[in-house]
């Protein structure tokens, strides 16, 4: 499988709050991993939220020894969200920050997606 990823801030916004991760090789026990996050426009630290959420999800998936893709992804999302919420509460400059998140992995002829 070959993959390609690109992101662009567009012509209106100065800052691109999008972030992505794309790996067509194994990440932990998943054979591949694709993630897109879009920091909430207009909210504080949206760029930080999208980047760090993806970095935490990738780290969690990499360390997870499980073999059930849904559980691996769900656990990674929950851990990343807990950290993001805590940071938002502890640091006023990040108060209210957030991001959307879409994760996919292809195993055999099945696509697993979390949104």
Feature-to-residue mapping (PLM):
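PP2C/PPM-type serine/threonine phosphatase catalytic domain
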Residues: 1-115
């Amino acid at each position: 499988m070959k993959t390609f990823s690109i992101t662009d801030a567009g012509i209106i916004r100065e800052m691109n709050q999008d972030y992505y991760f794309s790996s067509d090789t194994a990440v932990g026990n998943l054979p591949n991993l694709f993630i897109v996050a879009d920091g909430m426009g207009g909210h504080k630290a949206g760029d930080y939220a999208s980047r760090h959420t993806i970095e935490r999800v990738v780290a969690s998936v990499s360390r997870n020894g499980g073999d059930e893709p849904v559980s691996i992804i769900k656990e990674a999302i929950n851990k990343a969200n807990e950290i993001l919420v805590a940071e938002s509460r502890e640091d006023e400059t990040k108060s209210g920050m957030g991001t959307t998140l879409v994760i996919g992995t292809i195993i055999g002829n099945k696509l697993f997606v979390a949104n």
